[in-house]
Amino acid sequence: IDNTFANRIVDFADLPVFDGALTYVSIFFFEKKSARRKSIYFYKVPKLPFIVPSSEQFIEISYDSLEEEGWILKSKEVKDCLDKMKSATPDILKKYAKCWAGAFTGKDDVLMFMKDEKVPFEDAMTIPVIRADSCSRYAYAEPTRKIYYPYAENGDNTVLIPLQEIQNSYPQTYEYIKEHEEILKARKDSRKVFGDKEGWYGLVRFGKLSRFKKKKIVSPGEVKGNKFSLDITGSAFSCGRVFSVTSEDENVSVEYILAFLNSELCEFYLHNTAALKQGGYYSYSSTAIDTLPFIYDPKKAIDVERLVINI
């Protein structure tokens, strides 16, 4: 809209303005100006019912401080602190570590089981799974579920086992998936029906076995506070609900990265840059984690790792 600029924003953050809404609500006020405004005024509603704020309750944010990839609507003090964190660190986490998505069956009531449950097919065709409720800050994450997993490693790739091989080597599994063929084919992947694919008996998202097997950091995708955990069980994890972080630099240990991710400074940064959802939960995307300002100090690494191990 030509010559129209946002003048004020009233942010309801995670307050339950609409029943069932998961994203937060804001009110934008626009006005027409012949020249661009220098500032936008922002107010965060502390509680409901909503009381119209006075002009003095709004904080002033310079338009020049707003970036194209996303607006950080914070006070000048918070914005300066975030900028200082970025300028003081030479790298971002992505240089040393990588985020990974997990496995998604598309039909948990058919393909997911309790960890100790006896499944109606060969147990060799399952893999343990870590769920969000298994993650606690600095703790070892333990799998509480297992899923049907018809995949094998081919070099560094994870490939779907041919249906004929499943029939020959895992007859109970073959019988089980054929029994549920109609249900499995009805699953959708990006709005496309799974039955249209040759690999209809696979998972919607299957992850990567080589990354599952590595020592890794796991965390729920939506949290109120950082609760990065360590997984040494070689388990898969639920895509969308849990993500993992692995070290991609042999000199930087997973324990060092874990200490960084669970630090108060890292939590402060994420809580001021990640998307906020209803109930006070922050959504940690791979982009949010990858772009964290990060510094590796080899002189302190051994002491940091020792502290993490002894927690």
Which ranges hold each PLM region?
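Signature of N6-adenine DNA methyltransferases within the class I
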Residues: 1-113, 239-242, 282-288
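Polybasic, glycine- and aromatic-enriched phosphate-binding surface used to engage nucleic acids
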Residues: 74-303
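Short, intrinsically disordered, charge-balanced linker/junction segments flanking boundaries
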Residues: 308-311
